[in-house]
Structure formats: C-alpha cells, structure tokens
Amino acid sequence: MLRVARLSRLALLSLTAVIFSGCANINLISAVGSSSVQPLLSKLSSHYVLNHNDKDNLVEISVQAGGSSAGVKAITKGLADIGNVSKNTKSYAEENKQLWMDKKLKTITLGKDAIAVIYKAPSEFKGKLVLTKDNLNDLYDLFAGSKSVDINKFVENGQTTKNSNHNLIGFPRTGGAFASGTAEAFLKFSGLTQTKTLDKDSKEILEGQRNYGPNARPTSETNIEAFNTFVTTLRQPNLYGMVYLSLGFVNNNMNLIKSEGFEVLKVKYDNNAVTPSSQAVSSNTYKWVRPLNSVVSLLPKQKTLPSIQRFFNWLLFSNNSEIKKIYDDFGVLELTADEKKKMFKTGNAEMSNIANFWVDDYSLNNQTFGAL
C-alpha cells in the first residue's frame, strides 16, 4: 500500500535530494560515536536540514551511536566526517598525537551534560540515600562488581536500618572507561574528593583493564539500553541496585523513572545534598559534569568541510531560540561565552572572529581540546 503520507519531512527532503541530484550539490555528512551526543546531534541536525539548508548546497547529516571510542576511531581513520565523544579528547589526542596533528583535528564542544545515578531500594530507604566523599569508593566498588556492597553504605548520616541488609547490584557500561565516555565521566568527574584511595582491583575494572566482577550486570552503551536492562533485571522481587545515566536522559524520562519506583541519588557537596538537575549544573552546585564533543578534520581536501563549518557556525553562534529549546528538551546546557572562547585561537567568541575558531587543537595557543 502506498504510504507517502506517512513520510517525514526529512524523508521527503532526502527523496527530493536524490531525484534532483543533478540540480544541486548534495553533501552527505556522517557522524559516529557517543550515544550521549547522538540524540542531541540528531535532533539539531534534523532541524538544521529541514529549516536552514542552503538550497544551492544541500546537506544531509546521518548521526549514529557506538560509543566515544568508536567516534575517535571513525574520525582518525577517516571512516566518518564527525566523531562524537562525550569526554575530554586530550587523552585520545596525546595517544595519537602525530595523527591528530596530521589530520588537523579540532574538538568542538556542543554543550555540557551531567551524570546522574538512579536506584531501586526498599520502601524504608526511599529518599534516604546520599553519595558523599566518604562513600564514593563504595559506589565504585559496587559498579566494579568484585565486592558485595550493602545499601546501608549510602544511607544519609550513616543511620542503618535495623534488619534491612540488602546487597546492591551495579549496572556499569560494558568496556568501562576505556570504551565509554559515560563510564569515564562516572569514574573521573564526580566533583567529590575521595577520602581514601580506591581499591586497585576496582579501579582497574572500572577503567576497562579487567572484566567486571560477579556482582555487576554490564549493560550496552546507550542510555536507553542501560536503563532497560536495569528495569528488566530489577523487576524481580527483592533485587535492588544502581545505574548511572546521562542527566539529559533522566530529565526526559523522569515520569517513567518515578513510575517504576526508582529514585535519583543525591550528591553531597560541602555539606549540601544536591539533587541532579539542569539548574544545579548551571549554578555549579552539581558538579558531575562532562562535555559533549564533536571532532572534525580541518584538512582542506575534506570535501564536506564547508558544509560542516556552516552547520557548527549555526549551532554555536547563531543565538537561535530554536537551538536553545532543543538543548532544554534534552537537559543539555549551552556553553557560556567564556567557555566558547577556549575554542578560539584569539579574541572573542563571535561570528566576526570565526576564522580564529576554525583552528585545529594543536595549533591553538593553549592546545585546548574543546571548551571543558
């Protein structure tokens, strides 16, 4: 049966582009990498294609997930036009310094996301669990899976609940921090100062050097797959646990999270227990934050480079209210002017100075890798 009426505007544009390919220059841009960057960039690129496309230089943008390591591999090996990475790219750049320089790679920070932990607990524990600098290592031991960690470790003020001992299950990302930007942010960017050194075994497991222990249930990389594994496993009676997710995902699915009986873990900074939220990130009271980055090659022979530059110029410097709405919908914070300046070689973060923005990472004065 003919179903043209059901085609989305984007599908119609793609079909039109194919039919009239002789009448317009169509640039196909591919983006691969972080599952946290993917939904945001997909929405932004779809909006751009539908509303701001240059009729004389049509562009189509395909955004696929796969993890931050896949994004770095794709951009360094020329398998994609954009590599998406939800972590600081400095370690990748230093590991592949000559290749990074030869390809003139530039890290573009799209915005800021945060990590949030959600948990399932017995009714007597609901609202009572708090992460602090004193039990941070217990959280890491839980997700490493090599030790049994009781829920009472996270009860505020150390007040245990009589006859209520429940070992938790951690749901980490497969491959650990080596493969996942979300996992790296979970391990390294809590904003809490550990009071004790993390157990060597737990550290190596979470870094991805060793396999998870028997008490962990590793999940796929994407937020939705991690959440679904968490939900499905913990529907069994008397099982309790924790999973870390993108704050944007948590914000957008809060009703579902609450309907399943889950809670969001508070984090205590300077004696103030903070619930993760976009407002708390913006005010710097919640510090478990990571960058959402795209990496592109600035080599002149890159055929899609002009189209890529037009897209990111629109995204970062047009001050378009539609962009802000998309960011708000995903719970992602836009960069401040000062943060954008870090991606420029000189001067201010304005379109009038855009030539100084399109400078590769190793040619910047401070050799910065994105804005954060």
Swiss-Prot record:
It comes from the Bacteria. A lipid is attached at C23 (S-diacylglycerol cysteine). The keyword Cell membrane applies. A lipid is attached at C23 (N-palmitoyl cysteine). It is found in: Cell membrane. The keyword Lipoprotein applies. InterPro entries: PBP_domain (IPR024370), Phosphate_ABC_transporter (IPR050811). Residues 1-22 form the signal peptide. PROSITE patterns: PROKAR_LIPOPROTEIN. One of its GO terms (cellular component) is plasma membrane. Keywords: Cell membrane, Lipoprotein, Membrane, Palmitate, Signal. It is a lipid-anchor. This is Uncharacterized lipoprotein MG412 homolog. It comes from Mycoplasma pneumoniae (strain ATCC 29342 / M129 / Subtype 1) (Mycoplasmoides pneumoniae).
